[in-house]
Amino acid sequence: MATLISERQHPQAIWRDYLELTKPKVVVLMLITSLVGMFLATRAGVPWTVLVFGNLGIALCAGGAAAVNHVVDRRIDALMARTHKRPLAEGRVSPRAALAFALLLALAGQALLLTFTNPLTAWLTLASLLGYAVVYTGFLKRATPQNIVIGGLAGAAPPLLGWVAATGHMSAEPLLLVLIIFAWTPPHFWALAIHRKEEYAKADIPMLPVTHGEHYTKVHILLYTFALLAVSLLPYVIHMSGVLYLVCALALGGRFLQWAWVLYRGTRPHAAINTFKYSIYYLFLLFIALLVDHYLLLNL
């Protein structure tokens, strides 16, 4: 479809359309890592105002960035089976309304962070928002097959944001959590890119399977998964976590490697999408294990 429906008509949007613009499932996973960052940062407990309004501010800014992504990608979304029913692609929300909504979310999020956390958290969150909405969505996504590697730093920021919200300063520990998500991002997205290779090619998006082929991508997924396993052990190495986390990191990472190997071998028809799905469970469970282990250590 050469001309988007969203450029011809704008049926009245309902609240669910605006909620969809925020990519709520992605935001929830980001908030989990932000919460872990907060709780790991202090032994004394996180003030409820920081816990509630700090995470709400981060969520609003993330939702604003996601809404900008919908606007910029509306033509691409209309061409892909996974995204063609999104609000802008189907014309349920206009680009102007979506941008106004994104700006409102970002301003509200920044106001909450400045009021209830600290300026450093607000600045870092703003940098993450711009990194995703402008640098990744506006440029990198269409410019290079390494788009999600370079742009992955913005999406890896939530545990750092949570840590800084609770403490007011940066340190090595939250940067290690950022590194874990940074290493996780390529195998997570490239597995999906293999599954949706034809759609990305149709939309002219230079994802790695489109530009370099599936075998090359599978090799890199395997290599990044090995790197992720190694990086995920560093919290134990630097005594940030204990044995419980170590066991969980090894078990979860081993399973991720198993899926990456199955994908590489090409022995199962749905290995790519199953690897993608497992990667989501992996990140969620890894950070939960880190949090549980932290409180076990505090009570010893």
Curated annotation (Swiss-Prot):
One of its GO terms (cellular component) is plasma membrane. It is a multi-pass membrane protein. PROSITE patterns: UBIA. It comes from the Bacteria. Gene3D superfamilies: UbiA prenyltransferase (1.10.357.140). GO terms for molecular function: protoheme IX farnesyltransferase activity. Pathway: Porphyrin-containing compound metabolism; heme O biosynthesis; heme O from protoheme: step 1/1. This is Protoheme IX farnesyltransferase 1. It comes from Pseudomonas fluorescens (strain ATCC BAA-477 / NRRL B-23932 / Pf-5). The gene is cyoE1.
